[in-house]
Amino acid sequence: MLSKRIIPCLDVRNGRLTKGVKFEGNVDIGDPVETARRYYEQGADEIVFYDITASHEDRGIFLDVVERVASEIFIPFSVGGGINTVEDMRAVLVAGAEKVSVNSGAVKNPDIISQGAAAFGSQAIVVGMDVKQVQKSEAIPSGYEIVIHGGRKFMGMDAIEWAKTCEALGAGELCVNSIDADGTKDGYELTLTRMIADAVSIPVIASGGAGSPAHMYDAITRGGATAALIASIVHYGQYTIPDLKRQISGMGAKLRMVW
């Protein structure tokens, strides 16, 4: 059995690390470069960096910040935000990322997934999915709808069907973020995560809602996720990554332990 991963997420706005709740009220909490280095030194398995307003503002990602983060860490590094073309992907990979995460750009142009996979390999292509629970309908039979542009635009697309499409187009991984749970620290949306994990054969990262080691354990067991994305739980000093790994491992999950 492969070890499950613990992945800190850096939401970056104007070059600064921020955090909000349900995609609102983001506050400045520090320097993303220093924070990434600290998480790397603590034993994070991977770092995810999102330029959270790049798509909404219709601009490119802050490549200088990506380069600075990449120079400080020596673990897999995934970068997303404002990636709309294969050239955008190339620029992020050249800046030092191992993976690119496409979200709004893939919803608007699904071919970017297959184009990116052909150019760089499926292992480099992550599709980020921002999802909100809605009333079930013919268009949204699962009751989970895809939302883009930082939670601003509902797309009338069913999240489970979109996950299957992404896998078919060549995505190597899915990062499934529940807008309803984001930043609440009340636990992951396990029903959503499990439905998607059961619908695809590629790795699924659970995102949104981590508030305790038990929440993370639930995501990688009951939720079927291969990794747990975390933010508030470590950004505000509630836990360190070694704390989390020790407690989750003690519950019976297989993790890569801190050296």
From Swiss-Prot:
Its main location: cytoplasm. One of its GO terms (cellular component) is cytoplasm. Disulfide bonds: none annotated. One of its GO terms (biological process) is L-histidine biosynthetic process. CDD domains: HisF. Keywords: Amino-acid biosynthesis, Cytoplasm, Histidine biosynthesis, Lyase. Pathway: Amino-acid biosynthesis; L-histidine biosynthesis; L-histidine from 5-phospho-alpha-D-ribose 1-diphosphate: step 5/9. It comes from the Bacteria. It is an enzyme of class 4 (lyase). The active site is at 11, 130. Its EC number is 4.3.2.10. InterPro entries: Aldolase_TIM, His_biosynth, HisF, IGPS_HisA/HisF, RibuloseP-bd_barrel. GO terms for molecular function: imidazoleglycerol-phosphate synthase activity; lyase activity. It is found in: Cytoplasm. Heterodimer of HisH and HisF. This is Imidazole glycerol phosphate synthase subunit HisF. It comes from Nitratidesulfovibrio vulgaris (strain DSM 19637 / Miyazaki F) (Desulfovibrio vulgaris).
